[in-house]
Regions:
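Catalytic Walker B motif of ABC-type/P-loop ATPase nucleotide-binding domains
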Residues: 108-112
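Conserved catalytic loops of ABC-family nucleotide-binding domains
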Residues: 131-140, 148
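Conserved "ABC signature" C-loop
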Residues: 30-82, 178
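Helix N-cap at the start of a conserved alpha-helix in ABC-type nucleotide-binding domains
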Residues: 119-121
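ABC ATPase NBD Q-loop/coupling interface
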Residues: 1-18, 123, 127
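ABC-fold ATPase nucleotide-binding domain signature/coupling loops
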Residues: 62-95, 104-106, 189-191
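C-terminal portion of ABC ATPase nucleotide-binding domains
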Residues: 71, 127, 144, 149-191
């Protein structure tokens, strides 16, 4: 039985809170709260305004922020504040991405982070992905293979096991591989 290492240290030797602090995660089913936008980004009542704005800008939400009369103090939803704003699923996903960036952990895990975005917003995230994650180690989880093309390494899972690993072009050359099979199954809907 193997073990997972971080900086050559078995992860079971880490303090749990310390270990969890090195990860920022954007799940496809996340929760925003009926508090201010800045508090949602920071996941805390106290937050750094400049950092929250910077993270919202990187996540593609800055234009909407500028249209909000109360800025970062604008309540998300109207549950606790009649002047709160309703946001779309895509906008909520951008706020969730900003939250992960705000945490500024060395590892960022993105589980279908563009699922609720329209195609243009999704393209913006892909085209700026390296700028968004910067020097962090990013794990990008997606069933949509076209969204994995920009990844440095792609791991293909089948039955809970890694069955292929490599870059898009190389994986596509293996006409008997699972990646090729999945890619062509999805591509048939685009032609």
């Amino acid at each position: 039985m193997g073990c997972s290492l971080n900086d050559n240290v078995d992860i079971r030797k880490y303090d749990y809170k310390e270990y969890m602090s090195i990860f920022s995660v954007v799940f496809q089913d996340f929760k925003l709260f009926s508090f201010g936008l800045g508090q949602n980004v920071a996941a805390s009542f106290d937050y750094n305004e400049e950092l929250a704005k910077k993270c919202l800008e990187k996540a593609g939400f800055y234009g909407r922020l500028q249209s909000m009369k109360k800025g970062l103090e604008t309540s998300i939803y109207k549950d606790l504040d009649e002047e709160g704003v309703e946001i779309s699923g895509g906008e909520a996903q951008k706020i969730a991405l900003a939250r992960a960036l705000y945490k500024n952990a060395p590892f960022i895990i993105l589980d279908e982070p563009t699922a609720a975005l329209d195609p243009i917003a999704e393209y913006e995230v892909y085209s700026r992905f390296n700028e968004i994650v910067q020097d962090k180690t990013a794990i990008y989880i997606s069933h949509r293979l076209s969204s994995c093309r920009f990844c440095d390494v792609i791991a293909v899972f089948d039955g809970g096991q890694i069955v292929q690993r490599g870059v898009h072009d190389r994986l596509l050359q293996d006409t008997h591989g699972k990646y090729y099979e999945l890619w062509n199954a999805q591509a048939q809907y685009y032609t």
